[in-house]
Amino acid sequence: LAPMDRSSDPLFDYVGGYDYCLAQLQNMASQSQHNVGDVSSAAYTVPATLAELALAYEASPSTRLVAGSTDLALDITHGLKSIDRLIDITGVAELQCIEQRDHQIHIGAGVSLSAVEAFCQQPLPIMSDLLGRFASRQVRNRATLVGNIANSSPIADMPPLLLVLDAQLILQRGSKQRILALKEFNLGYK
């Protein structure tokens, strides 16, 4: 293979490469007809405890709960969703836990896919292997397993394995908790 001739490609003009790229991006942005969803006026809450989370959600049950926000961010940037209120659960320490108890793996709603991948290497290598193939490392560092389930996408990667494993969800609203089999969680198309 012959080396690529970069002399006529302004992207590889190392003297002005950065300026060229920046100018191109600014030009694309100014000509864009892309309708980006507006979240500038959204109320944003970051509770520190489960009790604070319960109070914030009880005050506004239509609020969107978020952790990684990877799918939500796509919907917003594509203008598909408008968000009025967000509760970010990443500040709730109780939801950042992952542990093995009684031959079960308990994964909090705020645990990233990368953390699940690392944790499951010994107790559940098939899950670790699957997560290693899931999206990019950047997405796995932000996205959560619970978000992948809650998003209810028909093309979500994790639910098939979780269904085979008879996964269960611990759902909580206020002080009330219940356990629900994953197979009973999604009742229809997203």
Predicted feature residues:
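C-terminal structural segment of proteins
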Residues: 1-190
